[in-house]
From Swiss-Prot:
Ranges that cross the membrane: 8-28
Family according to the record: Belongs to the CcmE/CycJ family.
Record's protein name: Cytochrome c-type biogenesis protein CcmE
Record's keyword terms, sorted: Cell inner membrane, Cell membrane, Cytochrome c-type biogenesis, Heme, Iron, Membrane, Metal-binding, Signal-anchor, Transmembrane, Transmembrane helix
Binding site for heme: H122, Y126
GO biological process: cytochrome complex assembly
Amino acid sequence: MTRKQRRATFIAVSLGILALAVGLVLYAMRDSIVYFYSPSDVVERGVEPGQRIRLGGLVEEGSLEQLGDAYIRFNVTDFAETIPVTYRGVLPDLFREGQGVVTEGALDGTGAFIADNVLAKHDEYYMPPEVADALKRTGNWQGEGAEAPHSETYGQGSYP
């Protein structure tokens, strides 16, 4: 082999190994690239109990319960499926029924979600794109002009 042929062979083999490595990394990360799963996604994909995921959707109206010892129970819904969530801790200030939420944790054996972290959306009008897409898929999207929950009091009151 000439020097030029060895260099070309080395480059071709190196590019092949690099492409294989990138492919393996992307394959391994295929499930962790998703920011969160909607309740419908959890049911459709058959998420295993104990598998850590992020569950996102809307906090179902009337589902918030204060349990003893700082435990809180509420339902997360995308209007097609609903998953009960149990959380122990202090909820974010922006957390309330009818608003978007992302929870981190795992399903237990009964299909309930045990959260160890709860993230609330930024303001009354923000909705994560994934939640909006899930609402559109289920036919519950009310459009850009729809009034946000509790919007009659938004902007009223005194601020420091």
